[in-house]
From Swiss-Prot:
Provenance organism: Magnetococcus marinus (strain ATCC BAA-1437 / JCM 17883 / MC-1)
GO cellular component terms, A-Z: cytosolic small ribosomal subunit
Any one GO biological process: translation
Residues passing through the membrane, by range: none
InterPro entries, sorted: Ribosomal_Su5_D2-typ_SF, Ribosomal_uS9, Ribosomal_uS9_bac/plastid, Ribosomal_uS9_CS, Ribsml_uS5_D2-typ_fold_subgr
Name the record gives this protein: Small ribosomal subunit protein uS9
SUPFAM superfamilies membership: Ribosomal protein S5 domain 2-like
Pfam families: Ribosomal_S9
Keywords, ordered alphabetically: Ribonucleoprotein, Ribosomal protein
Family the entry assigns: Belongs to the universal ribosomal protein uS9 family.
Keyword Ribonucleoprotein: yes
GO molecular function annotation: RNA binding; structural constituent of ribosome
Length: 130
């Protein structure tokens, strides 16, 4: 643990988050805005803080995030993934708890592509028997 900052990249759907954690007071800044301003919904703030609550590291790190792409839910998931990877970079002993919670696994689910001859990915035109 020679370095003071720990960097990681998190991904979810179309969102990519570059996360830097620094030992501090627990302040989270996302795209130069406080987390309360960037994420209005409390559920999204809870998702971002999940890695800290699982590892019992609340209010021990300041988090600086650059995130782009996707919507707010995908961005929150990308930040969670990035924070989890940065915490493992900080202390390898945290890996089993984060792995058990599933925070280190990249969620590979993405939007299914639209097919031609259909309205959406799976929605088809109405079937007429006669």
């Amino acid at each position: 643990m020679a370095q003071e900052t720990f960097n990681a990249t998190g991904k979810r759907k179309e969102s990519v988050a570059r996360v830097r954690i620094v030992p501090g007071s627990g302040k989270v800044t996302i795209n130069q805005k406080p987390m309360d301003v960037y994420f209005g919904r409390p559920v999204l703030r809870m998702v971002v803080n999940q890695p800290f609550s699982v590892t019992e590291m609340e209010n021990k790190f300041d988090v600086l995030v650059n995130v782009h792409g996707g919507g707010v839910s995908g961005q929150a998931g990308a930040i969670k993934h990035g924070i989890s990877k940065a915490l493992v970079d900080y202390d390898e002993a945290l890996r089993p708890a984060l792995k058990k919670a599933g925070f280190l696994t990249r969620d590979a689910r993405t939007v299914e592509r639209k097919k031609y001859g259909r309205h959406k990915a799976r929605k088809s035109t109405q079937f007429s028997k006669r």
